[in-house]
């Protein structure tokens, strides 16, 4: 059985990263797709674990070579998902989680219709604004860009399969875990098991 691609999206400050980290701890056979980006590395981030931090020149070369499943310029920086990473893990039967922006999600949706799309939303825009301002990791100009982009991204919630409102982290994590488990139980993902049962039943003689 092939793995499933899960796209988790939402505005900056909605809590996607925190949710994904917890989900990966609680579920087996799930891997996080590490994206490439041209933005500066934050103090707490690790190259190769949180992102692959590369120059814009290197990024554009990879675009020309067709190495990205999707890519977009977000908040003034380039972000891209490596096609080889995603496809190799799905073919191995592992579920892959992407943390990408709305532009990237819509791009993936056009190419991979069987992908599961989850939107992480804040309780309100006012709450989101407060979270971003409290973070204090970016310059004022960058914060303003993120707030404006958040307004735009929130308008696309109805393009997704599931909405998770992150009012409480534990509840939000459990909801995403439940979504993954539900998707794994779908008939379309278990045709091999169904066929085995049918073959077994056919092999039994009548009493």
Curated annotation (Swiss-Prot):
Record-annotated Guanylate kinase-like domain positions: 3-181
InterPro entries, alphabetized: AAA+_ATPase, GK/Ca_channel_bsu, Guanylate_kin-like_dom, Guanylate_kinase, Guanylate_kinase_CS, P-loop_NTPase
Class of enzymatic activity (EC top level): transferase
Residues at which ATP binds: 10-17
Annotated catalysed reactions: GMP + ATP = GDP + ADP
Top-level taxon of origin: Bacteria
Keyword Disulfide bond tagged: no
GO molecular function: ATP binding; ATP hydrolysis activity; guanylate kinase activity
UniProt-listed Enzyme Commission number(s): 2.7.4.8
Subcellular localization: Cytoplasm
Nucleotide-binding listed as a keyword: yes
This protein's UniProt keywords: ATP-binding, Cytoplasm, Kinase, Nucleotide-binding, Transferase
One GO CC term, this protein: cytosol
Matching HAMAP family: Guanylate_kinase
Function of the molecule: Essential for recycling GMP and indirectly, cGMP.
Record-stated family: Belongs to the guanylate kinase family.
Entry protein name: Guanylate kinase
Organism: Thermotoga maritima (strain ATCC 43589 / DSM 3109 / JCM 10099 / NBRC 100826 / MSB8)
